[in-house]
Each structure stands twice: as structure tokens, then as C-alpha cells.
From Swiss-Prot:
Protein name: Bifunctional protein GlmU
Organism: Brevibacillus brevis (strain 47 / JCM 6285 / NBRC 100599)
Catalytic center residues: H363 (proton acceptor)
Pfam families: Hexapep, NTP_transferase
EC class (word): transferase
């Protein structure tokens, strides 16, 4: 296989989106549209990816990083003009070049690989990715000769009655012989009503030069959907979501109700895990085998080991080890690590906390900036008092400790191994190993107190 290059057009402003965010940066299933395109190219081991930027160039660069090459289109003079901005980076190279659009996020590596294979088998100068639609109104039509080669692409407004009856359309996606592309591109003129340079003219230029131009029909036309407004964005989101769900289910994941579940592109889930309705799995979240996620679990960049149960809870930038349970109604904030066979129960908040194996924080507690050992019990209502108004301080609770209900651990403080903290205590000094710490007022009972107090309706003597 020859060397593969790609030009991705991402210079348009996208006024129909009616947004401050540049069009190609609008997300589909958690990832900017243009990132989907670049990632697909990267998965195909494309050697050179040149992204043509214009409006929002800095924002696009910030999202995509430095793994691609950028070409700047300062003036918007048409698609051929946009492609030509990549010439300094590609025109002297051998091989095949893809032409793609940053607002066409659904194209799969399977489809593009098939396009590439067909292009090389046909030894064509250019191969057009086409699609057959039930209603082709508004699209450029593919006109073929008797041999099935592409003669020309006719825009809808310029098409004859017979040409308008053609349902095979130009998707705008191409494979080119790289050297022939740049030679033909130099011949494109702007003698049209809009005064712009159109990349579709390259097909005619190549044909006039006696070159072979063919078309490859996409098996799934929906993959070629371009996004120009919020309606089409929602359609792309729905398609991508279905693709993601189908992939996970075919790999052995049970998704009870795909219509009420949201899973982003880069999420990984192992077999025999069950995802319940209302769950959101985002970012770089990974879920092991035999887990139960949801209902109503919201996980962002979370590492979940096998056999974990998470329900009605929010977890962000954290990790939970095998056979643990989280929820219902827990909030696990960034930097938290939950050990194996641990329990994080209802209305518990963790922040930058390390929870040991077999430790239980069953309910109504805040554990922040803390390291809790193995086999610890944190009683209901326990608070790590970590903030003095300027600095966050650390709380350490060692293995086997028992913290009674409604205790305050005022950091920095350490509770020793197998130590006890009596319920209702405010601990502001270290507790030695195996000790019992009691930090509360001794109870005093005032005998016959009630009879001495005035009450409504009670006659005073």
C-alpha cells in the first residue's frame, strides 16, 4: 500500500449553527466533530494529516494539539482554494490523499478503508465517495459513463431533468493520486457566479486530461452526513450514539435501555457488565467485567474495576477497585481512590481521598484530603475538617480504626491503627494505635428540671 495523506477542511465559520463555538468544535458524543475525523485518520495509520483552519484557528489548534499539521486559509475563496493551502506540505509527496471535512464526523475507518482499497485497485486518479439517497434534492449528482466511471459532478441547480432523476450524490469525500491532485488543483478557475474555486472542478479537469475517475458507493449513506446546523448536529449525535451502543452490546455488554443511556466515544466497557437507564459514561471512563452501573450513574474519566456496583451517583476523575459498591447518592470527586470490597454509601462525598480495601463509609459523611486505611469503619455523619480558610490539610486514619457517628476529624490529624473515636467527638490531636479517643462534654442530667420550667397552659404557683 502506498503512503497515505489526508487534508481535513476545518476553516468554515458555520453561521447556521448560531453559536460562539466554531462549527467543527461542536461535540458529537463528547468529542469535537473535527477530532472524530482526525482520530479516524490516525487509526488508519495515515502518515500526514493536514488540517486547513481559518475561523477559530487557535481554538481548533488548542483542541487537536500538535499531532497534526495546520494550514491557514486567511480568505474564504472556495473549497479548492482551501485544499490548496495544504500544498506546501504535501505536493511533493508520492501516494494517495484523502480529502475530508471537519463537519462530517460519522465516517468510519471501515468505510474509508474500503474507499482507499477500491481507489488503489482501480488505479484511479480520483475516487469519489458517493451515496444513494431516497431524495437527492439539493445535492450534486454523480453522472457515470457506460463503464461506470465518473464523467462529472453536476450541482442540483445546474442539472437537467434527467440528471435530477439520479439518486447517487457526491458526498464531498475523495481519494486522489497525490501528485495528480495538486497538478489539477492548479488549473481550477473561479469563473462562476460566486467567484469561488470549487474542488468539484478537479474531477472534470482530470477527465479532460484522460485520467480515470471512479466512484465508490458508501454502504451506509448516513455516515456521510454533514453537520451545518443544530438539527443536523442532533441527527449526528443520534447516529453516533447508536453506533457506540451497538458496538458495546455486540461485545457482551447489556444496556437495558439504550435510548436513555449516554456513552461517549472513548469509553471502554468489558463483557457481562450491565448498564441501567439514565446512566452517563463520559471521557476516558473504563469499566471492568461483571459490573452493574446505574440506574442514574454519572461517570466522567473514572476507572472501574470488575464486579463494582454504582447507582444514583456521580464520580469524576477517580478510581474504584474490584467488588466495591458506590451509592446510592454518593459524590466521588477528583483524585479519589476506592479500594476493593469497599462501600461508599448514601450521601457520602469523597474528595481527593484514598479509601482502603474493605473500608466502609456507609452514609452521610464528608471525607476530603484523606487517606483511610484498610478495614476502617467511618460512622454516619463523620466529617474530615480539612480547610482552615487558606490551606487544605490531610487526615489519616490507619488500618482497622473505628470512627463513631457524628465525629469531626480536624486536620491535620492521624487516627492510629485499630484505634477508636467515640461518637460525637471532635478530634484535633493524634490518636495513638489501639487507643479510644473521647472528645466531648460529660453528660449532666438535671433531675426534676422539667417541673421547674414554665410551660404553655401550665398554671404557675
Amino acid at each position: 500500500m502506498s503512503k497515505i495523506h489526508a487534508v481535513v477542511l476545518a476553516a468554515g465559520q458555520g453561521t447556521r449553527m448560531k453559536s460562539k463555538l466554531y462549527k467543527v468544535l461542536h461535540p458529537v458524543c463528547g468529542k469535537p466533530m473535527v477530532q472524530h475525523v482526525v482520530d479516524t485518520m490516525a487509526s488508519m495509520q495515515v502518515q500526514d494529516i493536514v488540517v486547513v483552519v481559518g475561523h477559530g484557528a487557535d481554538a481548533v489548534r488548542a483542541k487537536l494539539g500538535e499531532d497534526v499539521t495546520y494550514a491557514l486559509q486567511e480568505e474564504q475563496l472556495g473549497t479548492a482554494h482551501a485544499v490548496s493551502q495544504a500544498a506546501p506540505f504535501l505536493q511533493d509527496k508520492e501516494g494517495t490523499t484523502f480529502l475530508l471535512y471537519g463537519d462530517v464526523p460519522l465516517l468510519s475507518a471501515t468505510t474509508l478503508s474500503a474507499l482507499l482499497t477500491y481507489h488503489e485497485e482501480q488505479q484511479a486518479a480520483a475516487t469519489v465517495l458517493t451515496a444513494v439517497l431516497p431524495d437527492a434534492t439539493g445535492y450534486g449528482r454523480i453522472v457515470r459513463n457506460e463503464a461506470g466511471e465518473v464523467l462529472r459532478i453536476v450541482e442540483h441547480k445546474d442539472a437537467s431533468e434527467a440528471e435530477r432523476a439520479i439518486r447517487e450524490i457526491n458526498t464531498g469525500i475523495y481519494c486522489y493520486d497525490n501528485r495528480k491532485l495538486w497538478k489539477a488543483l492548479a488549473e481550477v478557475k473561479n469563473d462562476n457566479a460566486q467567484g469561488e474555486y470549487y474542488v468539484t472542478d478537479v474531477v472534470g479537469i482530470l477527465r479532460d486530461a484522460g485520467e480515470k475517475v471512479v466512484g465508490y458507493e458508501a454502504i451506509d449513506p448516513e455516515e456521510t452526513l454533514g453537520v451545518n446546523d443544530r438539527v443536523q448536529l442532533s441527527e449526528a449525535e443520534a447516529y453516533m450514539k447508536k453506533r457506540i451502543m451497538t458496538g458495546h452490546m455486540r461485545n457482551g455488554v447489556t444496556i437495558i435501555d439504550p435510548t436513555s443511556t449516554y456513552i461517549e466515544t472513548d469509553v471502554k466497557i468489558e463483557a457481562d457488565t450491565v448498564i441501567h437507564p439514565g446512566s452517563f459514561l463520559r471521557g476516558q471512563t473504563t469499566v471492568g467485567a461483571d459490573c452493574v452501573i446505574g440506574p442514574q450513574a454519572d461517570l466522567t474519566n473514572v476507572e472501574v474495576a470488575s464486579g463494582v456496583t454504582i447507582s444514583y451517583s456521580v464520580m469524576v476523575d477517580s478510581r474504584v477497585e474490584s467488588d466495591s459498591s458506590v451509592g446510592p447518592f454518593a459524590y466521588v470527586r477528583p483524585g479519589s481512590q476506592i479500594g476493593s470490597n469497599a462501600k461508599i454509601g448514601d450521601f457520602v462525598e469523597l474528595k481527593n481521598a484514598k479509601i482502603g480495601d474493605g473500608t466502609k463509609v456507609p452514609h452521610l459523611s464528608y471525607v476530603g484530603d484523606a487517606e483511610i486505611g484498610d478495614g476502617v469503619n467511618i460512622g454516619c455523619g463523620t466529617i474530615t475538617v480539612n480547610y482552615d480558610g487558606a490551606v487544605k490539610h490531610k487526615t489519616t486514619v490507619k488500618d482497622g480504626a473505628f470512627i463513631g457517628c457524628n465525629s469531626n476529624l480536624v486536620a491535620p490529624v492521624t487516627v492510629g491503627q485499630n484505634a477508636y473515636v467515640a461518637a460525637g467527638s471532635t478530634i484535633n490531636q493524634d490518636v495513638p494505635d489501639n487507643a479510644l479517643a473521647i472528645a466531648r462534654e460529660r453528660q449532666v442530667n438535671k433531675i426534676d428540671y422539667a417541673n421547674k420550667m414554665p410551660r404553655k397552659g401550665k398554671k404557675q404557683s
